[in-house]
């Protein structure tokens, strides 16, 4: 028992926030997180929750796609090694040559301070400047890393501070690098079948009125398709119904605020856009 207590005392809870690693021409913060998770699975760490995909203010004019940031929470005995490696991932994979401004935040503690939660709540509906984010990092002595203008720090801080009062799940499938930028080939009938079979446990999969598949993005990013649903079981089941000939790199399930309506808790004021 004595050795077990010492082991637990040496464990560190590490919250990791990542944002703005992508550009309109490529990359995706969730794909980078998928790569990081694959690395972490080979380390002596424990995941404390599902990877979290949090979508913030949808009205941000400079957002790339869904304005989503990612949080990972782990328990580790070697936080320094983990932080160094994740920083390398962000520096190497971010599409900075095409305008990405990645931000990365680390917070070591089981309890997230109220200041993080407040920052995150504002990010759901307000425009928060990178200057405010850098000031927050400085005033709270937060470990961080950024490239470009540092806009990604806003989402990274907000991801760490986000509190789930409701959640859904999102299963994202990723393409192999050789397929990036190529047309996505997916069976429309299988997506129709998936929706009719799994709805309402899954949602936003197929637009019946306009006869349009909703689960596939249209840009050159690594995502092949994404299924949103109420439970882990429902999104995994749905993915087994979707048919495609393309060989995929893999998939990851995120805990998400998609479809929860938490962006609607505040009315956007015109003055906030000035």
Language-model segment annotations:
Residues 10-55, 64:
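N-terminal ordered "arm"
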């Amino acid at each position: 028992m004595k050795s077990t207590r010492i082991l637990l005392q040496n464990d560190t809870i590490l919250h990791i926030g990542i944002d703005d690693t992508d550009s309109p021409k490529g990359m995706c913060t969730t794909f980078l997180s998928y790569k990081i998770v694959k690395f972490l699975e080979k380390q002596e760490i424990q995941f404390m929750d599902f990877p979290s995909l949090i979508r913030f203010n949808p009205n941000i004019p400079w957002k790339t796609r869904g304005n989503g940031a990612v949080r990972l929470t782990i328990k580790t005995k070697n936080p320094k090694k983990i932080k160094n490696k994740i920083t390398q991932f962000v520096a190497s994979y971010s599409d900075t040559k095409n305008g990405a401004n990645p931000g990365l935040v680390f917070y070591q503690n089981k309890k997230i301070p109220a200041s993080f939660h407040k920052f995150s709540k504002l990010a759901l509906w307000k425009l928060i400047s990178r200057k405010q984010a850098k000031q927050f990092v400085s005033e709270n002595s937060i470990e961080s890393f950024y490239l470009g203008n540092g806009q990604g720090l806003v989402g990274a801080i907000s991801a760490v501070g986000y509190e789930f009062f409701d959640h859904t799940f999102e299963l994202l499938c990723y393409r192999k690098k050789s397929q990036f930028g190529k047309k996505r080939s997916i069976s429309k009938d299988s997506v129709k079948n998936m929706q009719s079979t799994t709805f309402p446990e899954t949602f936003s999969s197929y637009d019946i009125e306009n006869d349009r598949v909703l689960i596939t993005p249209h840009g050159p990013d690594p995502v092949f398709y994404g299924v949103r649903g109420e439970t882990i079981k429902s999104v995994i089941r749905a993915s087994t119904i979707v048919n495609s000939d393309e060989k995929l790199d893999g998939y990851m399930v995120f805990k998400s605020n998609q479809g929860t309506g938490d962006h609607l808790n505040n009315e956007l004021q015109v003055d906030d856009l000035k």
